[in-house]
Each structure stands twice: as C-alpha cells, then as structure tokens.
C-alpha cells in the first residue's frame, strides 16, 4: 500500500485512512463552478490529510443539467475533461470518486469515475438503476457491479438509487466487498421512503460492511438542504451530517476495515 495514503496515529501497525466527503451544493451547476468547487474541496481535504475524496452523484455537471439552460459537457477519456482532476489527484496524492456524466463509445452514463493517487484514470461504476425522469433518463443504465482493491480495501461503488436494492448489496458481497461507497443526490422523503432505510438494507445485505454515503446540499433545482451524508455499519446508521456546504472527514482503519470515527470532522466552506 502506498505509505503516503495513511496516517499512523496509534503507533506501528495501526494505519488510518482519512476519507473526505465533499457535501456541497452542485445540483444546478454551472459545470465550471462545480469543477472549481470540487478542486477547492480536494485542496482543503489535503490540508486535513485526507487521501480519499468522495463527491455526490453528478457533482461535475449537476444533477439538474438537463433541466437547466446552462452549458454542460459529458466527460470522456478523449476530451480531457478529467485532466484537471487527474492533476489534482497527483498533486495531493488523493483518490477521487467523481460523480459525473460520462460518455463511452457514444453511450452516455451517470457514473462514478475513480482517479488514482498517481493521477491516472482507474475505472468507473455506471448507475444501473436509472429512474424515468428527465433528470436521469438521458443516461443508459449500467450493466454490472464490480469490487476493486483500492489501496488494500475491497470496495464496491454505487450511485444513489443503486443502493435501494438488497440484491446489489449481495452482488458486491459475493465479490468480497469490505466497504461500499455510495454517491448520491437523495433528499429526505422522496418516492421510496426514507433513504436511510435503503442504506441500512444495503449494509445488511452486504454482510454488514461499512457504507459511506456522500450526499449533497443546496436548494436550487431540488431541495437537498436536509439531505444527509452518512456512515453506516452492520445495518445501522452510525452518524450523519446535513446543512451548510462542508468538507466532512472520517478515519477508517484499513487493516481492520472499520470506521474509527464517531462523528464527522466538519469544515464549513463559509468558515474558511
């Protein structure tokens, strides 16, 4: 494992991975502003020694990009739209989980693109459960769930409504997942009951593994002012955050595959 990714806070043999959640308002963009905000969040997370950075669903273009008159562009490996994020990952030695619209072989996807700490594109998960709304039906659904060994942690990645279905938790569990990362645009209430019920179900169906929910805030387009980012384990919510735009940081024990934090360390953007 790359030693720079971890902090040895309790002496030899206890290596702690710091994970940052960029709980910002992204829903209506514009894309250029969202990109700047993500880069700002990465820089701030680096100041707090965070080595993984999670963003919400469609953080780059904005979840409401199809209902806005603002310009947007889908990311691809050809158009260099990911380049500034790749450079930031290399500069800060971070792994970025980037919620974005992505196009591959002319097929548009609602994706979580993963960029490695060396600044290279690693892989992506495409949202499999695309709801029939204008905000989502532009994207073709993904076909699979994969588990990747990311810095020694077998990690499954899901996008928002993917987390609603217990069978998706079972699929990543079958592949040996030790951690689930969920990027979301999921306000409370919604059309399928409280989101935390789905997240608990996901954790239980994946053998109780920790589940990290990176949600968003803001009121433009969709009211996410009370949307929660959350950490779960063994089918229960450990702690949550809702409110102002903030970078949220937790400690994760890479060896024991356990969440060490009991609450988020919260850095409000307005306080900087």
Q: What is each stretch, according to the model?
A:
Residues 25, 56, 97-101, 182-183, ...:
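A cross-family glycoside hydrolase active-site/sugar-binding cleft signature
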Residues 81-95, 164-247:
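CN hydrolase (nitrilase-like) catalytic-core segments centered on the catalytic cysteine
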Residues 100, 111-114, 146, 228-231, ...:
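Short beta-strand scaffold segments in enzyme catalytic cores
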Residues 16-28, 54, 124, 153-162, ...:
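Active-site-proximal beta-strand elements of phosphoester/diester hydrolases
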Residues 31, 36, 40-117, 188-209:
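Cys-nucleophile CN-hydrolase/nitrilase-fold catalytic domain and related Cys-dependent amidase chemistry
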Residues 104-175, 188-201, 254-272:
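Active-site catalytic loop in hydrolytic enzyme cores
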Residues 22, 125, 148, 214, ...:
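Hydrophobic residues at beta-strand termini and immediately following loops
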Residues 1-15:
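N-terminal amphipathic/basic-hydrophobic helices that include classical n-h-c signal peptides
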